[in-house]
Amino acid sequence: MAEASPQPGRYFCHCCSVEIVPRLPDYICPRCESGFIEELPEETRSAENGSAPSTASADQSRQQPFENVDQPLFTLPQGYGHFAFGIFDDSFEIPTFPPGAQADDSRDPESRREREQHSRHRYGARQPRARLTARRATGRHEGVPTLEGIIQQLVNGIITPATIPNLGLGPWGVLHSNPMDYAWGANGLDAIITQLLNQFENTGPPPADKEKIQALPTVPVTEEHVGSGLECPVCKDDYGLGEHVRQLPCNHLFHDGCIVPWLEQHDSCPVCRKSLTGQNTATDPPGLAGVSFSSSSSSSSSSPGNENPASSS
């Protein structure tokens, strides 16, 4: 009688990231038909008992693909679920259980530890690309918000970390303050930059005195101005012959409707930055006006060595 062909061992496909039974005799993955597979050692418990893992245990391992997870990113109160980083290579997903079924992690700690040991022994140091996974907490009471609802509320700024006692204890990405203080979405960073730039709108020289603004002379535009292509520095419109414009002490000309609103907010010429008093606001801020930095002359004049000797009679 011919001997039966040996049963293929347990293999792990690195392309599919799942445990498979290879297709013989080529030893390829039956799902992706790739040869990038690796034979897995027998389980310790199976070696001690002298039997292969049962079908029910294998089915249970396939139904619990999220045993091997790292420390949670951050935790929420009991019943809210928690985030964790898994070592799988697919996109973010939330595992669910069939109707009427429950995860037995809380009721059977021994079984959960066996699955964790089985997962560590099965994958070892082989850790494909990390992905963000989530596990639902069991035993959620009626009326407790779901994990999706909590995330949506955090994003919308409806609730703050003060209402969630255990929020913000993870190693990365911790919310330490109001969620509205963070940059959310694709336009969040642009909104923060715009807010920072708007803080500089009211900086600069103080408004000019109304008496000085009203005292600015009005001069007509001459042919020399028109021939040189002179234009208003504010609106960039060319001056017309005989048009009346306002002249600043720095001799720059402006339309009355262009320069008056500017001077009501900033006491400086838009071209040369000189104030109506002739001070250069770009190099000498108004707050430092009248402060003298010439200390060398005063120190030299007060030095005893520089005193003229008294003439002897």
Curated annotation (Swiss-Prot):
<feature type="modified residue" description="Phosphoserine">
    <location>
        <position position="5"/>
    </location>
</feature>
<dbReference type="GO" id="GO:0043161">
    <property type="term" value="P:proteasome-mediated ubiquitin-dependent protein catabolic process"/>
</dbReference>
<dbReference type="GO" id="GO:0005634">
    <property type="term" value="C:nucleus"/>
</dbReference>
<keyword id="KW-0479">Metal-binding</keyword>
<feature type="zinc finger region" description="C4-type">
    <location>
        <begin position="13"/>
        <end position="32"/>
    </location>
</feature>
<dbReference type="GO" id="GO:0070936">
    <property type="term" value="P:protein K48-linked ubiquitination"/>
</dbReference>
<dbReference type="InterPro" id="IPR001841">
    <property type="entry name" value="Znf_RING"/>
</dbReference>
<comment type="function">
    <text>E3 ubiquitin-protein ligase that mediates ubiquitination oF target proteins. Depending on the associated E2 ligase, mediates 'Lys-27'-, 'Lys-29'-, 'Lys-48'- and/or 'Lys-63'-linked polyubiquitination of substrates. Part of a BAG6-dependent quality control process ensuring that proteins of the secretory pathway that are mislocalized to the cytosol are degraded by the proteasome. Probably acts by providing the ubiquitin ligase activity associated with the BAG6 complex and be responsible for ubiquitination of the hydrophobic mislocalized proteins and their targeting to the proteasome.</text>
</comment>
<dbReference type="GO" id="GO:0042059">
    <property type="term" value="P:negative regulation of epidermal growth factor receptor signaling pathway"/>
</dbReference>
<feature type="region of interest" description="Disordered">
    <location>
        <begin position="96"/>
        <end position="128"/>
    </location>
</feature>
<keyword id="KW-0862">Zinc</keyword>
<dbReference type="GO" id="GO:0042147">
    <property type="term" value="P:retrograde transport, endosome to Golgi"/>
</dbReference>
<feature type="compositionally biased region" description="Basic residues">
    <location>
        <begin position="118"/>
        <end position="128"/>
    </location>
</feature>
<protein>
    <recommendedName>
        <fullName>E3 ubiquitin-protein ligase RNF126</fullName>
        <ecNumber>2.3.2.27</ecNumber>
    </recommendedName>
</protein>
<dbReference type="GO" id="GO:1905168">
    <property type="term" value="P:positive regulation of double-strand break repair via homologous recombination"/>
</dbReference>
<feature type="zinc finger region" description="RING-type">
    <location>
        <begin position="232"/>
        <end position="273"/>
    </location>
</feature>
<keyword id="KW-0963">Cytoplasm</keyword>
<feature type="compositionally biased region" description="Basic and acidic residues">
    <location>
        <begin position="104"/>
        <end position="117"/>
    </location>
</feature>
<keyword id="KW-0863">Zinc-finger</keyword>
<comment type="subunit">
    <text>Interacts with CCDC50, EGFR, FLT3 and SCAMP3. Interacts with BAG6 (via ubiquitin-like domain); required for BAG6-dependent ubiquitination of proteins mislocalized to the cytosol. Interacts with CDKN1A. Interacts with AICDA.</text>
</comment>
<comment type="pathway">
    <text>Protein modification; protein ubiquitination.</text>
</comment>
<dbReference type="GO" id="GO:0005829">
    <property type="term" value="C:cytosol"/>
</dbReference>
<feature type="binding site">
    <location>
        <position position="29"/>
    </location>
    <ligand>
        <name>Zn(2+)</name>
    </ligand>
</feature>
<dbReference type="GO" id="GO:0035519">
    <property type="term" value="P:protein K29-linked ubiquitination"/>
</dbReference>
<keyword id="KW-0007">Acetylation</keyword>
<dbReference type="GO" id="GO:0042127">
    <property type="term" value="P:regulation of cell population proliferation"/>
</dbReference>
<dbReference type="GO" id="GO:0061630">
    <property type="term" value="F:ubiquitin protein ligase activity"/>
</dbReference>
<dbReference type="GO" id="GO:0070534">
    <property type="term" value="P:protein K63-linked ubiquitination"/>
</dbReference>
<feature type="binding site">
    <location>
        <position position="13"/>
    </location>
    <ligand>
        <name>Zn(2+)</name>
    </ligand>
</feature>
<feature type="binding site">
    <location>
        <position position="32"/>
    </location>
    <ligand>
        <name>Zn(2+)</name>
    </ligand>
</feature>
<feature type="compositionally biased region" description="Polar residues">
    <location>
        <begin position="47"/>
        <end position="64"/>
    </location>
</feature>
<dbReference type="GO" id="GO:0005737">
    <property type="term" value="C:cytoplasm"/>
</dbReference>
<dbReference type="GO" id="GO:0016567">
    <property type="term" value="P:protein ubiquitination"/>
</dbReference>
<dbReference type="GO" id="GO:0006511">
    <property type="term" value="P:ubiquitin-dependent protein catabolic process"/>
</dbReference>
<dbReference type="Pfam" id="PF13639">
    <property type="entry name" value="zf-RING_2"/>
</dbReference>
<dbReference type="GO" id="GO:0008270">
    <property type="term" value="F:zinc ion binding"/>
</dbReference>
<feature type="binding site">
    <location>
        <position position="16"/>
    </location>
    <ligand>
        <name>Zn(2+)</name>
    </ligand>
</feature>
<keyword id="KW-0832">Ubl conjugation</keyword>
<dbReference type="GO" id="GO:0006513">
    <property type="term" value="P:protein monoubiquitination"/>
</dbReference>
<feature type="region of interest" description="Disordered">
    <location>
        <begin position="42"/>
        <end position="64"/>
    </location>
</feature>
<dbReference type="Pfam" id="PF14369">
    <property type="entry name" value="Zn_ribbon_19"/>
</dbReference>
<keyword id="KW-0833">Ubl conjugation pathway</keyword>
